[in-house]
Amino acid sequence: MNEARAETGGPNRTPRSEIRPAVSANRKKEPVLLLDLSTSMNWGAADEYDPEWPDAGSRRAIVIEALHGLVRVLEQEDSEAAGDQASGDDERGGLMTHGFGNRYVEIGDLNSSNLERRLNEIKWGGKTYIMPAWKAALADYDEEFGDRDPDEQPTMLTLVVTDGEADDWMEFEPVLEKATAKRVFVVAIVGHGRKHDATLVAYQQAARKNAARDKFGKVHVEVVSFDAVTDPEEIALDLITLVS
């Protein structure tokens, strides 16, 4: 294997050789991030004895650093973000982000200018209720693109970054099962251990059910495990491959 593409992490880490773009390059897409803010995101990424947030080895710190790498690439593709930041406005343009924990948190556009500040201003902690964030993301997309002809609407590419199965999984699983070529999901799972592995299995099963519904057997839910990965650059590069 090419050493530059070698992966680190635990036994369930998705091989990097299997990671590919979720949406083909010739299709227009609108990426959106659903970010897990639950308490366990403060825990260590690779071991239960690892130091917690604000240590650089915590899941939260690693994810924030990885998102820096992702948004830098995405804003090169986003003329609005580039224009807004050139004019000194870092509030607009970037990766539209919705947080989920005990409740929905509207985070807004994340870009390289505001990411650190925005993610440190919000309240982290609690359980893992994802549906309110998904509904908000869908409403945002419909507001921006709903009046366009269906052929002119970009693919809604939803990146879910999480470390655990949703507390409202029974509601979210059918959303994944019904994913389409116009509504694609990438699920990136960080953390380690039994909780990570159970989460991975649940999302993989939803992805298989989704593929079974497609008459051509195509998969519209990509599930990637970052089992015990502690290198944010490695995660960023894989997210860039999946989303950009």
Describe every region a protein language model picked out:
Residues A22-S24, V73-D89, A139-Q153, L176-T180:
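Surface-exposed acidic, glycine-flexible loop patches that form ligand/cofactor-binding
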Residues Q205-S244:
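C-terminal helix of von Willebrand factor
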Residues S79-I122, D197-Q205:
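Short beta-strand-loop
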Residues M1-E52:
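Acidic, polar low-complexity linker/tail segments
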Residues K127, G164-A211:
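VWA/integrin I-like adhesion module and closely mimicked acidic/polar interface patches used
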Residues K28-K29, S40-R92:
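…and closely analogous acidic/polar surface helices at protein-protein or active-site interfaces
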Residues R103-I107, S113-T155, A166-D168, I189-A198:
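Von Willebrand factor
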Residues L35-S38, V63, L70, T97-F100, ...:
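DG-centered beta-turn motif at the end of beta-strands
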